[in-house]
Amino acid sequence: FEGQEPLRQLPWTAPKWGNDDDFVDLPAKEVIEFACGEILKYRTPAGARHLAGIHQPHPVGDGWGLQATPEGRKAGEPIPVTLSPENGTMVNGATAAFRSAAKIDPMCYQWNNCLMLQYFASVFQANSGAELFAQLVKNYFSIGGGQHQPNVVNVEDLKAAQLHPADYQDLIVRMWGVSAHFVSLPREVQDEFIARFDNL
């Protein structure tokens, strides 16, 4: 897409996963469930079953070695984490992302079916913020969702931590199923994490 920004914008502005749009979600469901079904047909030499999964825990490192992709992602840019929408494309909010993810049967990809979403800390400072969040997650599970890994942070704190890491040694974020000190992460990983808050 180098020097071809109008061309890149054509697919980039098309409907994207994570916005509760069947035009995008149902083909993804079909491909994922087909692949999982094929994997489950086979056994190891010892007779054990293979487990299928949508496992992509390293969006920055894996993105470095990947050329541009048809949806408009540039070469070397991070790729989405597991079931999560691509950074900057979740335009219909968390509820829509939950609905997209719940369309795929979580039992077909038991190894990893995590939906990682970010939330502004201010949501939880409102009177009923925690209760509303709890209900949101319960609803996700009630419609067939698998796992959900939330991150609740203040983006301004993340940016300040990049400038003054000594002042933010206790800032913890969830990355790929584990908790990490934000300031200990490489700058590229920090930048990708902050970019997850685009369009929220």
Where are these regions (language model features)?
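Acidic, glycine-enriched catalytic cores built around paired aspartates
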Residues: F1-L200
